[in-house]
Amino acid sequence: MKILYSLRRFYHVETLFNGTFVLAGRDQETTGFAWWAGNARLINLSGKLLGAHVAHAGLIVFWAGAMNLFEVAHFVPEKPMYEQGLILLPHLATLGWGVGPGGEVLDTFPYFVSGVLHLISSAVLGFGGIYHALLGPETLEESFPFFGYVWKDRNKMTTILGIHLILLGLGAFLLVLKALYFGGVYDTWAPGGGDVRKITNLTLSPGVIFGYLLKSPFGGEGWIVSVDDLEDIIGGHVWLGFICVFGGIWHILTKPFAWARRAFVWSGEAYLSYSLAALSVFGFIACCFVWFNNTAYPSEFYGPTGPEASQAQAFTFLVRDQRLGANVGSAQGPTGLGKYLMRSPTGEVIFGGETMRFWDLRAPWLEPLRGPNGLDLSRLKKDIQPWQERRSAEYMTHAPLGSLNSVGGVATEINAVNYVSPRSWLSTSHFVLGFFFFVGHLWHAGRARAAAAGFEKGIDRDLEPVLYMNPLN
C-alpha cells in the first residue's frame, strides 16, 4: 500500500550525525533516520520488521536455553539452589519439575529437557528471523494481507491487540493445566515443609480474586503481592485466562469507539510507548513479588525474603536461649520491651527486638506455632519441630541483603554465608529494567505526541542558552 505522507515530514526529530552514510540502500535523507536508529528504518516495512521481531525472540529463547543448560551443568544437588546463584532452575522447580518433599531436587533431567527444547526453538526462530530480514518480502500487505498492516489502521491494530490477548490468556491456562492435571506445582505450604501437589480446590470466587486488586499496597495489606496460597494463585490464572481470551475476541470483533480514536495517538511509535509502559508496570510488580512473596517464589528455591530471614534469626535465638533456661515469655530486652516476644500494635504476640517491624511475615516454618492471638507461648515451649529449627537457622544465614542501611537486626558479614540471594538479583534487575522501560515510555510517548501534533523538530537550537555564554577558556 502506498504511504500517504512524506516520511521526512512525519518523522519530526532531526538527527544531525553522519547524514551521508548509506546502509542497505537507505540513507538519512530518504528515510529521515540515521544508521544508528536501527529498526526505525523498518517502520513501514512490515516484512523486515517481522524478521527483526522473530530474530529478537530467537535471541531471547536462545538465552533461556543456554542459561538453563549452564545452570544444569553447574548445579550441585547437595546445596540449596539459592546458594548457587541460579535464577532459571528455581522457576522450573516451582512448577513442580524434578523436586520432591522439602524442595529437594530428585532429578535434573527435566531441567536438561527444558534447556534443549528452548535451544531447538531458538534455532527455528533464528532461521525465521534471518529469512524474513534478508529473503522474505519487504512488506506483507500485498502478498499476505492477513499479516500486513498500516500503523494508522485502527481496526487492524485492535485486531492485533486481540490476538496478543488470546495468546496471553492461553499462557495463563497452561499454568492452570500444569497445576490441575500435569503433575501439580510446588506448594511451600504443604504440611511438613513443602511438597509438589495437584491443586484440587481452586479459588474461583470473584470476591476473593478481585479482593486482592482492591487491597491497599501498603504493609499488612500488600495488594496482589500478599497472595499466600496456591489455590488463589491458580484460580487467579483461571480468571486471567478467561478475561484475556474474551477481551481478545472482543478486540478482534469490534472497532475502536470514537472516544478511543480521539484519546490515543495511532502510530507505530505510540504503540511502542504503550508497550513500554505496560512492561515497566510488569517490571515493578515482579520486583515486589519476588522480594516479598514466598508462595509464588518459594524460599526453598529463591532463599528467604528479607523479613523471613530477620524473623528466622529471632526464632533461632529464641530456641537456643529457651534450651539454656531463659523464660522467653517474660525476658526483657535492653529497651524494656520483650527480648524474645512482645505485642504488636493490635495485640498479637510477635517476636521482639529489631525484627518487630516484620511482625506480619507469614512463612510455612512459622505458622504452625501461631494461635488465635499470634505466637502461642505453649507451642513455642512444646511443639517446635527439628525441621523448623533447621530451616530457620538456614534462612537466618542466607538473608537477601547486601545493604548499607539497617537490616532488621540480621547478623551480616562475619557470622553469615557470603552470597547474593537470587531474590536480590531478580528484584533489583526487574526494578532497574522497569525504571528504564518507564523512561523509554516517556521518550517514545513524547516523540509520538510531537509527531501527531505536527512538530518537525525537538527544541529550537537557536534559543539554546549555551550560545550566549562565554567560552570556558
Curated annotation (Swiss-Prot):
It holds the Pfam family PSII. The modification N-acetylthreonine is found at residue 15. It is a multi-pass membrane protein. Keywords: Acetylation, Chlorophyll, Chloroplast, Chromophore, Manganese, Membrane, Metal-binding, Phosphoprotein, Photosynthesis, Photosystem II, Plastid, Thylakoid, Transmembrane, Transmembrane helix. Binds multiple chlorophylls and provides some of the ligands for the Ca-4Mn-5O cluster of the oxygen-evolving complex. It may also provide a ligand for a Cl- that is required for oxygen evolution. PSII binds additional chlorophylls, carotenoids and specific lipids. GO terms for molecular function: chlorophyll binding; electron transporter, transferring electrons within the cyclic electron transport pathway of photosynthesis activity; metal ion binding. It is found in: Plastid, Chloroplast thylakoid membrane. The keyword Transmembrane helix applies. The modification Phosphothreonine is found at residue 15. InterPro entries: PS_antenna-like, PS_II_antenna-like_sf, PSII_PsbC, PSII_PsbC_sf. GO terms for cellular component: chloroplast thylakoid membrane; photosystem II. NCBIfam families: psbC. Belongs to the PsbB/PsbC family. PsbC subfamily. One of the components of the core complex of photosystem II (PSII). It binds chlorophyll and helps catalyze the primary light-induced photochemical processes of PSII. PSII is a light-driven water:plastoquinone oxidoreductase, using light energy to abstract electrons from H(2)O, generating O(2) and a proton gradient subsequently used for ATP formation. PSII is composed of 1 copy each of membrane proteins PsbA, PsbB, PsbC, PsbD, PsbE, PsbF, PsbH, PsbI, PsbJ, PsbK, PsbL, PsbM, PsbT, PsbX, PsbY, PsbZ, Psb30/Ycf12, at least 3 peripheral proteins of the oxygen-evolving complex and a large number of cofactors. It forms dimeric complexes. This is Photosystem II CP43 reaction center protein. It comes from Brachypodium distachyon (Purple false brome).
